[in-house]
Amino acid sequence: MKTLSYNIKIYATPERVWDILWGNETYNVWTKFFSCDSQMKSDWKVGGKTYFTDGDGNGMVSTIERIDEPNEIVFKHLGMIKDGQEDFDSEDVKAWAGSLEKYLLVDYNGETQLHVEVDIQPEYEEMMNNGFDQGLAMVKHLAEKLV
């Protein structure tokens, strides 16, 4: 497992950036650089369930390990969902189960420093770098557009 980190300064409040990251209307706009038709469904509870899926409903089953809106959220990835079936036990899943994805938003007088850390398998590094570079640039664009 490898941990990648990303940082971007956004000229908007943490509340605004949080809304862009997790809002129903904007989540799939910035995550399209990872997968077309990306969706996130969550009960927003620590220890609850969060699903990160593609347009076919396939993707990851995760939980929120820590949340302090609008300053921090940490997702723990637990398994996969494919064809409606959740998988927590296959060898593929065991290779990365327990990996974390962290978002930290720090307020500097109305500007936000967004820091992201994600645990990945090395073979996904290029995909993650491309996705986060383009995705976080889109978050910045969306957050600053209406400020």
Residue ranges and their predicted role:
Residues 1-39:
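Hydrophobic ligand-binding cavity/cleft-lining segments
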Residues 8, 50-53, 59, 63, ...:
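Charge-dense, helix-prone N-terminal extensions
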Residues 94-97, 119-147:
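A conserved amphipathic terminal alpha-helix motif
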Residues 17-21, 27, 50, 64, ...:
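Hydrophobic pocket/interface hotspot
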Residues 1, 49, 70-72, 109-113:
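A generic structural signal for beta-strand entry/edge sites
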Residues 33, 38-43, 58-109:
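Hydrophobic-ligand binding "helix-grip"
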Residues 3-4, 47, 99-102:
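Short structured motifs
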Residues 78-82, 117-123:
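Short, solvent-exposed aromatic-acidic interface loops
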